[in-house]
Amino acid sequence: MMTCPSVPAIPTLWLFSILLLVVSLNAQNKSWDNPICTEGILSVPRGNPAVMTCNISNTFTDVTIQLSANGKDKTIFDKKPQGNFSWRGWELQVQGGQAQLVIKDTQDDHTGIYLWQLHGRQRCYKNITLNILEPSNEDKVPDTTLFTSFPDHAKSSPIEGKPGTLVGVITVIFILGVAGFITFIYYRHRRS
């Protein structure tokens, strides 16, 4: 009668542990977008510029902006990639992980809720409400450049924007420790 040699359990468990480690570390290399946008309600005097921004920690794939006002939804920019775009008084600049919507001369038809659909590594939705106020004489701003320079992401900390990294590393170490402990117990049990 012929018997097949059995596959030792220890190398199998170690291979499984290494595979688990590789998969876990690969998952940790993908950072979340962590969107930061103009918050809540933006109130601007009629005729003045309005600037709304959304920034993510990764590069934008595309940006869609819709305006909801008076019970109607209107798409202003649909799935715009990197670049500068203009349409009926709205200007959109998408550069890296930063998007900026500028209205140079705000009017009543600009009032409403702006739904930002951000697409980087994930999809995220943000609402910004724009209210138009009656201007006073001192509210009028002289015409200046509205686009601000964007900060360089290369100078920011590599840990910034990745709060889950430490939790992921601790989880991987814990799983490997448990796998090692189970392997040790199994090995001792088989030898006794």
UniProtKB/Swiss-Prot annotation:
It is found in: Cell membrane; Secreted. Residues 28-165 are extracellular. It is a single-pass type I membrane protein. GO terms for molecular function: cytokine activity. Keywords: Cell membrane, Glycoprotein, Membrane, Secreted, Signal, Transmembrane, Transmembrane helix. The chain crosses the membrane at residues 166-186. GO terms for biological process: immune response. Glycans are attached at N29, N55, N84, N127. GO terms for cellular component: extracellular region; plasma membrane. SUPFAM superfamilies: Immunoglobulin (SSF48726). InterPro entries: Ig-like_dom_sf, Ig-like_fold, SECTM1. Residues 187-192 are cytoplasmic. Its main location: membrane. Residues 1-27 form the signal peptide. Belongs to the SECTM family. This is Secreted and transmembrane protein 1A. The lineage of its organism: Eukaryota, Metazoa, Chordata, Craniata, Vertebrata.
